[in-house]
Amino acid sequence: MALELAAASLLGAGFTQADRLLDLSTPLGQDRLLAERLQGTEQLSDGGFVLHVDALSDDAHIPLKAVIGQPVQVKLQTALGRDEHRVWCGLVSQARFEGANGGFARYRLRVEPWLALLRQRRDSYAFQDLSVIEIIDSVFGDYNGQGAVAPQWRWEVKDRDTYAKRSLTIQYRETDYAFIERLLAEEGLFYWVEHEAGDGEPGTHTVVIADHNGAFEAGPQASVKFQRADATETEDTIQAWRQSRTWRTNAVRLATWDYRAMQARKASAQVDDKLPNAMELADSDYPGQYLFEDGDQGDRLAHNALAAQRLRQSLYEGEGTVRTLAPAQRFTLTGHWGPSQGAGADFVVLRIRHDARNNFDESLGRAVAQALG
């Protein structure tokens, strides 16, 4: 009986997401699905983001094909104000019916950027006399106008002329996603996803591809406090902070065969600040013929490969309630007791994991848990 009363109470309130911590917009219409929980991961490159959204409905017969592949929007209310939200926009790559009981039905949606579709198409193709920018533009552009997909991407590179035309680039029995990720890694490029909220409907998202640290900008909360959890604190804070250091490769050597000049070409890069008593640990590779046509190109590729190794030499991990943080954002940590742990320093978010539950009242939350677990 309590379940039916709770369901009736929810429906009597108009099944609305107004003023809730989490808000979910789908093509089904406003409030057909009520966000219950958000779990997700965002990162630089590696697909951009994946969100898992548990949603409640009074309808246990929503056809899953009505949402699969469709654009959706998730909003998370932040500490900056009731109308200040962290927004994610993406496509539903998987929809599941989790069960129904006592007037409630639960669905789970997996939300990803349009890049996820590139995992579903495999091809073999030869790109001739094109730069990496031109190749990626060509692959992404091929998805324009296909169903509900409207790919958006933007380049934030220092100098497009840095990326010379590649005489021959082969995609061989690779998915478009694996091919693009490989090209980006070879050229020292990385990306993240930016989101723009829609007005009453799902918004849009853009893949931003960059090659320099100047592309990282401060977010809405540019200065973040290190502080213990406190119910009276009005500002989101970081409450745990850890540093790790790892012994990494400290030199890169590349070699390639220039079949036009009929000679071998070499390039290398080495760090100047080795750890005390460290031996040289070189990554030597022969990636194939005509990888670079001159020394400048070779040195750039070698330095990119070394930078990728060194990135993980010193990393910081934190836990907290800062809902505005996103990949590629800069922030300054304040209030930490240990200067050696980064207090007062600038950081860039590489990866972030979210876990949020909606602000249901106690009786409703208890009824949902009893009905659906």
Predicted regions located by residue number:
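Amphipathic alpha-helical and helix-coil boundary elements used as assembly
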Residues: M1-G373
